[in-house]
Each structure stands twice: as C-alpha cells, then as structure tokens.
Swiss-Prot record:
Gene Ontology MF terms in the entry: ATP binding; CTP synthase activity; glutaminase activity; identical protein binding; metal ion binding
Region (Amidoligase domain): 1-270
Binding site for CTP: 13, 151-153, 191-196, 227
UniProt cross-references to PROSITE patterns, sorted A to Z: GATASE_TYPE_1
Alphabetical list of InterPro entries matching this protein: Class_I_gatase-like (IPR029062), CTP_synthase (IPR004468), CTP_synthase_N (IPR017456), GATASE (IPR017926), GATase1_CTP_Synthase (IPR033828), P-loop_NTPase (IPR027417)
Residues that coordinate or bind ATP: 14-19, 71
Active-site residues, Swiss-Prot/TrEMBL: 383, 520, 522
Protein name per UniProt: CTP synthase
Glutamine amidotransferase type-1 domain ranges (all copies): 295-547
Top-level EC class as recorded in UniProt: ligase
Function: Catalyzes the ATP-dependent amination of UTP to CTP with either L-glutamine or ammonia as the source of nitrogen. Regulates intracellular CTP levels through interactions with the four ribonucleotide triphosphates.
Any one of the GO CC terms: cytosol
Enzyme Commission number(s) of this protein: 6.3.4.2
Length: 550
C-alpha cells in the first residue's frame, strides 16, 4: 500500500518546497523505495498553459502532453520516475470535475459544498495520481501543496490532506512543513517567531507536522532549534536546518545528514536499505571542479526572471557536468539589442535563443541570430528560436525580405512560419484550428518520435531518431522549405505523420555549429545523464573559445 508524505509551506512562498520534496524523494529512491511526487496548485486556472511566465515561471511539459508547474521538472531531474498529467492538478481542475458531476446528477440532488465534495475530489485526485505512477505502485507518494498555510486558496487542500491522513490511519501518512527562519541584521540574530506562528496556523486546522524544514540563509544553531522544537511541539531531531546552498544538488546530502529520511521511514514504518548518495556527491564534485569555462548568451524577453527558463538553465548545468566545463549564462534582453545593436554579443562563446510567445523582442532575437550565423558563433534555437532562425535565413540568405511568422504579422505575404491549421488529437482525429481558436489547451504538446536525416549533425548528436517534448502552435511552413534548402539550410528531422519540420541546421561548410529544434530538449535533461544536444552545444562553445585563443 502506498504511503503519503504531505509537504506544506509557511510564512512566505518560494522557499523551495519543490526542491525539498524532490530531494527527499531522491534520498528515498536511493534507499530502494519506489517514489512518485504530486504537486497541488491552489490557483483556479485549469493549468498554467496561458499564464504569464512573469507570474508563474516556466511551464513544464510532461511526456503525455500536460502543461504543468515547473516543480515537476525538479521532480524528474531528481528521481527516475517520469511525471504525467495526473501528477499535477489545480483548484480549477477540481471544481471543473465537481461541477461536471453535479450537472450529470452524480450527487443525487444534494447541496454541493467544499466539505465533503471538494475535499473528497481532492483526495480522489491524489490517490489517482499516485496510482498512475510510471514506476508501478509506489511505496511513497510525496504530495507538495502549493501556497502557504493561512492562504484562503490552500485551505481545501490542507483539509483534504488532514482527512486523508485520518482515513488512512497511523503510520500511513506524515506531514513535513517548510518554513522561514529569517535573519534580522539589525538584531544580529535569527528569528523563530514566524515559524512558531506558521505551525500554530497548521495546528489550528488539525495538522501537527512530524518534521519542520527551517529555511534560513545560514545553519540554524542548536539553541534556536530547541526553541522551535519546544514551541512547535515537534521533536528536536525533527527540526531540520535547510540553509542556502550554491547548488540545489547539495540538498539531498544536506537533508540526509540531518536524518530526514530516517525520520520519515520510522514514521511510516518502512525498513528500506541504507541510502547511497554517491551519485549526488560525484555530481557536486564535478560542478565544483570544472576543467574549462565558457560564456553562453541567452537572448530572450523574460531575462529579468530566470524562473521562466528553469529547465533550460538546468540543462546547461547538466551539460557542464558532463563536459567538465563551467557554463556562465549571460541573460540578454532582446529589446535592448533592437535599440543598441549586437555589440553585447561579441564576447560570447555561443548564443542561445529559447522558446517564447508574442511579437515583442523578436527583431532583436533575429538580429542576434544573424550575428551568430555571420560571425560563425555556435547557435542553438529552441522552439521560437528555431522559427526565428528560419526567418532570419529566409530574409538574409534566400532573399525573402518580408519573411515572417503569422504570429507576429498575420498578413505577411511570405509566411515562412505559420499556424498549423490541422492537428491530430490523441485519438487520431483531425481538429481544425484558426487564429480565433481558444488559446488554452490548443498547442501541440507532449513527446513525439521522429526519424533523423542520415549524414546530418542531428544524426551525430541523436542517432537515427529523436524523441522529445513539444509545446507550440506555429511551425515552419513546408511551402517555403524548397527555397530554404536551395539556399543551403538543411531540415534534418521531420514528424512521420504530419511531415512537419522538427530540426534544422546549417552544413559545416556554412557554419561550424548552427542548430534549431522545434521541440524542447531541456525537459528531458537530467543531472544523471545530461542531454546529447546540450553537451554538443557546450562542446561547440568551448571549441569556438579555444579557436579564438581567448
């Protein structure tokens, strides 16, 4: 039978519940347990697909095509279990399901209320998510509840967790509470009152945490831990200090050294083998002792909030691990390039243009791509970055001066990138979409395997085929491909069913390393294995730096 660990947060958001939950999962997995994770988001949106990256951060896409919270990316990077749509749900999905049942008559005329109907539905979603784990029936399901204790939006989720713990019985569920212990510089000390009040809030709704994870900018002294223990009614050894680290991959060892996994296993009456965190210590060793160093420029419009590119940043870090190369990322605002030109790019070893939506900043990205192509600087374009690379090539090499995407210029005569009007859904039916279709849930999403053209750089990187995740509604227009290929551009991978361009590259006779991909390879990169595309990109950046004698 699956046992549950509920992870809650207090005082403020963005303390790192997702990293803490993923780190605990990594330790338990190293002890031989089958582990899955779920993220419960209290917002009313059905999914984060149409939310601004400035508000929500990155949207992580699962293999089965779900648009989910970025914490699911952390989960996949820390454990071997792949996430699915059922691993993330929102208040919007819960209410949508309950209202659908009410309309269908499932409640037999009863008054539908938050308790019991909403809370019962939350419990059903949790158990369904755990049961659908790709690892088989998990020994432990770690459930991260978004928001903070005291938020009105989180109350139904906390109440559902309390009810579920009571229903499952002793030693079947436990609670881990992550809270802030701020350092007040004027007083010269850590303050425990916010943590005490946060735990009191939790106890008011009937939840007594078994473990406190105390976030601070430094290790919490023993006397402060004793104070927290006494006022929170949590055993002293279960008050665990979680201080700022320069790498998230140090957190599993930090938590294990303080006995978090032992406490959880004792509470849930589990007797697994001892933890083996050798892999994590080796990763940290590689991170801290690189042999080389490169600087890669990431040109985008969300550069002020790096959470928007969380998986991409981590994928570059993974590549640094597997190439013994420290990767410095410079975030460059594409709108500044539109104003000031490309001088800010001239010291870079490589240029990367990530995915994005909307017209703002696109001409700056195109200028950056042109610079990378003409200066022979390694270039990687992801999703929109590939589309803009094709537009740049069409304008400046092929001579299609009005080449553009209908996303930015609906009336452009040279629609090099256009909306895919006919899509195949998962049942194989054709669905026609237009520019007026709803935005939510209307993208090409999830994994798709594609054959790769022999003799290309793509084949050197991936092999005979590529299986990556997608999130887009625009594609390179096949009508212009013959002209692009006549100019030298290579379409190196296509979808087998719709024949859509998936990868493009320039031959080495034109450029040493210039690749665009319509998919999002960053979603499948892990610290354990890295990713072949990002490893090749970092190696190309290093070769460029060495060739320049820098």
């Amino acid at each position: 039978m699956t046992k549950y660990v509920f992870v809650t947060g207090g005082v403020v958001s963005s303390l790192g519940k997702g990293i803490a939950a993923a780190s605990l999962a990594a330790i338990l997995e190293s002890r031989g347990l089958k582990v899955t994770l779920l993220k419960l988001d209290p917002y009313i949106n059905v999914d984060p697909g149409t939310m601004s990256p400035f508000q929500h951060g990155e949207v992580f896409v699962t293999e089965d095509g779900a648009e989910t919270d970025l914490d699911l990316g952390h989960y996949e990077r820390f454990i071997s279990t792949k996430m699915r749509k059922a691993n993330n749900f929102t208040t919007g999905q819960i209410y949508e399901s309950v209202i659908r049942k009410e309309r269908r008559g499932d409640y037999l005329g009863k008054t539908v209320q938050v308790i019991p109907h909403i809370t019962n539905e939350i419990q059903a979603f949790i158990e369904r998510g755990a049961a659908s784990a790709t690892c088989g029936e998990p020994d432990v399901a770690i459930v991260e509840i978004g928001g903070t204790v005291g938020d009105i939006e989180s109350l139904p989720f906390l109440e559902a967790a309390r009810q579920m713990s009571l229903r499952l019985g002793r030693n079947s569920a436990c609670f881990v509470h992550l809270t802030l212990v701020p350092y007040v510089a004027t007083a010269g000390e850590l303050k425990t009152k916010p943590t005490q009040h946060s735990v009191q809030k939790l106890r008011e709704i009937g939840i007594l945490p078994h473990v406190l994870l105390c976030r601070a900018d430094r290790r919490i002294p023993d006397d402060e831990s004793k104070k927290i223990s006494m006022f929170s009614n949590v055993p002293e050894d279960a008050v665990i200090s979680v201080w700022d680290a320069d790498s998230i991959y140090k957190i599993p060892q930090m938590l294990h050294d303080q006995g978090l996994d032992r406490i959880i296993c004792e509470e849930l009456k589990l007797s697994p083998k001892d933890a083996d965190l050798t892999m994590w210590s080796e990763l940290v060793e590689k991170l801290e002792n690189p042999k080389h160093e490169v600087t890669i420029g990431m040109v985008g419009k969300y550069v002020d909030l790096t959470e928007s590119y969380k998986s991409l940043i981590e994928a570059l870090r993974h590549a640094s691990l597997h190439t013994s190369t420290k990767v410095n990322i410079e975030y460059i605002d594409s709108e500044e390039i539109e104003t000031n030109g490309v001088d800010s790019l001239k010291h870079l070893d490589a240029v990367l243009v990530p995915g994005g939506f909307g017209r703002r900043g696109t001409e700056g990205k195109i200028a950056a791509i042109r610079y990378a192509r003409e200066a022979k600087v390694p270039y990687l374009g992801i999703c929109l970055g590939m589309q803009l690379a094709v537009i740049e090539f069409a304008r400046n090499v092929v001579g299609l001066k009005q080449a553009n995407s209908t996303e930015f210029e609906p009336d452009t005569p040279e629609r090099v990138v256009a909306l895919i009007t006919e899509w195949y859904d998962r049942d194989g039916k054709v669905e026609t979409r237009t520019e007026e279709s709803d935005l939510g849930g209307t993208m090409r999403l999830g994994s798709q395997r594609c054959p790769i053209k022999p003799g290309t750089m793509a084949e050197e990187i991936y092999g005979k085929d590529v299986n990556e995740r997608h999130r887009h509604r625009y594609e390179v227009n096949n009508r212009f491909v013959p002209q692009l290929e006549a100019g030298g551009l290579i379409i190196s991978a296509r979808t087998p069913s719709e024949d859509l361009p998936e990868m493009m590259e320039l031959p080495r006779s034109m450029h040493p390393w210039f690749v665009g991909v319509q998919f999002h390879p960053e979603f499948t990169s892990t610290p354990r294995d890295g990713h072949p595309l990002f490893k090749s990109f970092v190696e190309a950046a290093l070769a460029n730096k060495q060739a320049r004698g820098v």
